[in-house]
Amino acid sequence: MYSDPYFAKPAPKSTGREYFNAGWLDKQLNKIPGIKPEDVQATLAELTALSVAEQVQLAGGCERLLVCGGGARNPLVMSRMSTLLPGTEVCVTDDFGVSGDDMEALHSPGWLFEPCPVNRVIYPQ
């Protein structure tokens, strides 16, 4: 699963159900006949934690990682990220007063403006 081209793309990147969906999973599972459902769940949790940890490490690491979304509610994903990122405090955004459920609305404008240099406004043409 980790050989999917998405994981080789450079940051910043984002994705969701438009790419990682039942069709994607079916293609992956066809390569591994007879896999048990609990092994699928464990593999997806590990894939999530590993891909996040790798990107954090490629960016130079961090002292604290704030997690939101479905992964923040998954104890296995949170535990694995903590293990894969020694020295990094892995927390949920809710612990800092920002509801993980509201993050998508807050994230989208930030994603649009992230590439803008400080003190420089870029106007659409």
From Swiss-Prot:
SUPFAM superfamilies the record matches: Actin-like ATPase domain
Disulfide bonds: none
Gene Ontology MF terms in the entry: ATP binding; phosphotransferase activity, alcohol group as acceptor
Name of a matching Pfam family: AnmK
PANTHER family assigned: ANHYDRO-N-ACETYLMURAMIC ACID KINASE (PTHR30605:SF0)
InterPro entries to which the protein is assigned, alphabetical: Anhydro_N_Ac-Mur_kinase (IPR005338), ATPase_NBD (IPR043129)
Protein name (database record): Uncharacterized anhydro-N-acetylmuramic acid kinase-like protein
UniProt record similarity statement: Belongs to the anhydro-N-acetylmuramic acid kinase family.
GO biological process, one term: amino sugar metabolic process
